C-alpha cells in the first residue's frame, strides 16, 4: 500500500513540472474572463477566446478581487509562456463548468481506496450546485487545492485518479481519514 501511495503522489499534478503554475494561470485568467477581459496573448485567446469580451481593464467585484489576490499569492514564482496555446491541466474541461474555481495549494494528500458511500462531486460549493460525477468506493482521491468555506461547511475540490490517469473531479463536503480510506498519502 505504501508503494502504491508513493506512485500515486508521484503521478499527480504537483510533480508534473509546470502543471501547478498552469492551474493558477488558468484560474487567474478565468476570473478576468468572467469580468469581460479581452485577451491579446495566444494562450488567452486559445483558452478563453474574445467572444463577448468588453474591456482590457475590467472592474472586478470584491469577491473576484479577493479570489484574485489569493491566486496571485499562490502564483508567486510561476512563469507561463503566453505564446503557448494549451495548458497542462488534466481536468480543464471540468473546470470550464465550475461555478467556483479551485486554487491550487502548496501541499497535497490522498485517500487511496475510498471506503465511504457514493458522494456527489459538484460544480460549486453548494448542495444545490450541479452534480458532475459521483465519488465511488475504491476511488483514489487527490486533495491538492485550498478548501473553501461556504454555507457553514468546508468544501474540497477533489480529483479522482485511476493508476495515475485522471478520471473525474468536483467539489464535495468530505470528511476523510483512516475510517473511509484504505490508505492515506501525503
Locate predicted features.
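SH3/SH3-like beta-barrel superfamily modules
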Residues: 131-180
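Compact alpha-helical subdomains of small soluble proteins
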Residues: 47-100
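C-terminal partner/receptor-binding element of secreted or periplasmic proteins
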Residues: 82-95, 171-186
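Boundary of Sec targeting at the N-terminus
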Residues: 15-18
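Sec-dependent signal peptide recognition
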Residues: 1-9
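N-terminal signal peptide c-region/cleavage motif recognized by signal peptidases
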Residues: 11-13
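Beta-loop motif signature
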Residues: 98-151
Amino acid at each position: 500500500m505504501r508503494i502504491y501511495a508513493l506512485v500515486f503522489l508521484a503521478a499527480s499534478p504537483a510533480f508534473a513540472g509546470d502543471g501547478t503554475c498552469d492551474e493558477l494561470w488558468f484560474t487567474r485568467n478565468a476570473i478576468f474572463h468572467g469580468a469581460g477581459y479581452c485577451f491579446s496573448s495566444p494562450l488567452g485567446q486559445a483558452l478563453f477566446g474574445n467572444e463577448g469580451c468588453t474591456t482590457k481593464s475590467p472592474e472586478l467585484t470584491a469577491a473576484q478581487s479577493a479570489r484574485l489576490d489569493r491566486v496571485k499569492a499562490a502564483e508567486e514564482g510561476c512563469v507561463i509562456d503566453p505564446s503557448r496555446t494549451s495548458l497542462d491541466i488534466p481536468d480543464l474541461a471540468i473546470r470550464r463548468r465550475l461555478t467556483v474555481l479551485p486554487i491550487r495549494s502548496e501541499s497535497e494528500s490522498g485517500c487511496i481506496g475510498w471506503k465511504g458511500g457514493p458522494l456527489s462531486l459538484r460544480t460549486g460549493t453548494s448542495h444545490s450546485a450541479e452534480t458532475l460525477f459521483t465519488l465511488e468506493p475504491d476511488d483514489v482521491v487527490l486533495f491538492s487545492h485550498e478548501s473553501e468555506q461556504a454555507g457553514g461547511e468546508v468544501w474540497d475540490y477533489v480529483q479522482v485518479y485511476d493508476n495515475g490517469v485522471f478520471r473525474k473531479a468536483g467539489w464535495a463536503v468530505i470528511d476523510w481519514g483512516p475510517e473511509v480510506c484504505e490508505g492515506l498519502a501525503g
